[in-house]
Amino acid sequence: MYSLARPFLFSLDAERAHALALRSIDTAYRTGTTALLARRPVPLPTPAFGLIFPNPVGLGAGLDKNGEHIDALFALGFGFVEIGTVTPRAQEGNPKPRMFRLPEYQAVINRMGFNNLGVDALVANVQRARRTGGLLGINIGKNKDTPNEEATSDYRYCMERVYPLADYITVNISSPNTAGLRELQEEQSLRRLISDLRETQEVLSAPHGKRVPMLVKVAPDLNDRDIDAAARVLADLAVDGVIATNTTVTRTLVANHPLAAEAGGLSGAPLLGQSTLVLRRLRARLPESIPLIGVGGINSGADAVAKMAAGASLVQCYSGLVYRGPQLIGECVNAIRRRREAPSGGAVSPL
């Protein structure tokens, strides 16, 4: 079905096609025809962060920024859906056009800039959702006009608002599309921010009667020394998990494309190798008690297996859905199932 719709979607501006695809998924959900888009995979229960995921394949943050399509997305067969990035106050993001497809490379460049309706709107949408079929992650960020010195207050405010509703919370400090945001990954800044948020997490756990896992999403552009420093901080502060990785600002593998000079984060197939290297290095340097989610460049079941082989407990797709459609979900689940059933399925590939 998606193969028939793709030529029309690709004839549209990328952001307009994005919105139309979401409306189509909603329509399929309301009319009970989601099965025409994707066959729900057989469950493959997967433990991580003290939770049991129905299957290990999730939706990465960015597709549903405001939590407006949660039930329709779960119906496609995701084991978990991550919504956001959401900020305390609504913001428009960067000027359009701000999303570009590179079909020759099965890639996307975006400079959305955390466009969202604000955390209160997201909370209202989540409260209305039925949320059947999977677990819900909520990805939080800071407003673009909040200085880094005050970033903790933005993240804390979002955490307090979404805590009762989230199955896990992701702290996004790695988007390249908010000026200065990635500076929060520097060792001392990271330690201050995550220490404060870990304290907030523990304070919130008592009144809500539950401890919601807190994950940190990192960039693929960190050098080895930065990765080692980040791993040191995240291990010291005992975060619940790490998502590796966000989009990249490098253009090495798409340098000859006419859109390569567009500012923003590159995602899709060219990111697979770079993001998987970061994932593997983090797995080698973090304790096994901190699970990893592998994201970046997954366009096939084999790509998902590569993430698992590098040490991921779960994987997420996003740009791959643009090129492959919802069938990618079941393909990834089934590939991971076959790997799990193989005699060497638990091995992590060496550095």
Curated annotation (Swiss-Prot):
BP GO terms, sorted: 'de novo' pyrimidine nucleobase biosynthetic process; 'de novo' UMP biosynthetic process
UniProt keyword Heme present: no
Cofactor or coenzyme needed: FMN
Active-site residues per Swiss-Prot or TrEMBL entry: 175 (nucleophile)
Entry keywords, A to Z: Cell membrane, Flavoprotein, FMN, Membrane, Oxidoreductase, Pyrimidine biosynthesis
Subcellular compartments: Cell membrane
Superkingdom of this protein's organism: Bacteria
Functional pathway: Pyrimidine metabolism; UMP biosynthesis via de novo pathway; orotate from (S)-dihydroorotate (quinone route): step 1/1
PROSITE patterns cross-referenced by the UniProt entry: DHODEHASE_1 (PS00911), DHODEHASE_2 (PS00912)
Cofactor: binding comment: Binds 1 FMN per subunit.
SUPFAM superfamilies: FMN-linked oxidoreductases (SSF51395)
Xref: InterPro entries: Aldolase_TIM, DHO_dehydrogenase, Dihydroorotate_DH_1_2, Dihydroorotate_DH_2, Dihydroorotate_DH_cat, Dihydroorotate_DH_CS
Membrane topology listed for this record: Peripheral membrane protein
Any one GO cellular component localisation term in the record: cytoplasm
Group of enzyme by EC: oxidoreductase
Catalytic activity, reaction form: (S)-dihydroorotate + a quinone = orotate + a quinol
EC number: 1.3.5.2
Binding positions for substrate per the UniProt entry: 65, 110-114, 172, 177, 246-247
Function: Catalyzes the conversion of dihydroorotate to orotate with quinone as electron acceptor.
Family: Belongs to the dihydroorotate dehydrogenase family. Type 2 subfamily.
Quaternary context: Monomer.
Annotated PANTHER family: DIHYDROOROTATE DEHYDROGENASE (QUINONE), MITOCHONDRIAL (PTHR48109:SF4), DIHYDROOROTATE DEHYDROGENASE (QUINONE), MITOCHONDRIAL-RELATED (PTHR48109)
Record's protein name: Dihydroorotate dehydrogenase (quinone)
Organism: Xanthomonas euvesicatoria pv. vesicatoria (strain 85-10)
Species classification: Bacteria, Pseudomonadati, Pseudomonadota, Gammaproteobacteria, Lysobacterales
